[in-house]
Amino acid sequence: GSAGSAAATRLSEDPQRSVLLLEAGPDYPDFETLPDELKFGYATGTDIMVSDEHNWQFTGKANEIAETMLVPRGRVTGGTSAINGQVFLRGLTDDFNDWSSEGNKLWTFEEGLPFFRDLETDMDFHDDFHGSGGPIICHRFKRDDWLPSQTAFYSACIEAGFPAVADFNQPDSHGVGAIPCNNPNGIRFSTALGYLAQARHRVNFTIKSNCLARRLLFNDLSVTGVEVESGGESFVVEGEQIVLSSGTIANAQLLMLSGIGPSDHLQEMGIDLVLDLPGVG
């Protein structure tokens, strides 16, 4: 997942920790070795969508009668941030506050704002809501650079009464305007570029690519290791602490393969139950 690169980089800042990052897909150790479809934000979507080298090629349906659609998920260091459309929008303020109201006061938008600021360098805005020294570079296309269709859409929205928005990452903004993007000079600035690049030289940090996590290993309800497959061989990786950061879909998938999830579904799939947790998946 995209967050795995950030978590591993931050954890390895402590030289007393030994950090291992397992990646199911390939890893590219420097910018020059990145394939063009990952490097450039305006590469054709076909390359990424068709190839399974960097994309899990998941599909899904919105409902029973809808047509099957692609659900692109990154299979490379940087996760889906390495193949996505580089839209750098924060979540809605009300969503964060709704989550917090369920019991965790640290999930409010106000509590999360310092982390949003820390992860970005915003090229356009320099105020209390934006960062200036973070690893991910953010910008907005100027009106002179818009396509004719974008200019026409903007003008039509203004004529229809929608307010103009200069910054969609400003809390409570709504209307029409340029979206923030993390693709300076056309480069897709993934978390692999923004975070991992600064950590690769650390002696306490190791990246192992093409290592697929098959399941988590437990001692009672404590995770002690991961069963991994690589090059047709299986082996176990153990650690004092295991951080699961496999993305929106694979996190739930790996938990269920490991026996954590709704008991009836796990039983149906022939998976031994570790913990009945209906919310998983």
Give the ranges of each region predicted by the language model.
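N-terminal redox-cofactor-binding region of secreted/periplasmic oxidoreductases
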Residues: 1-281
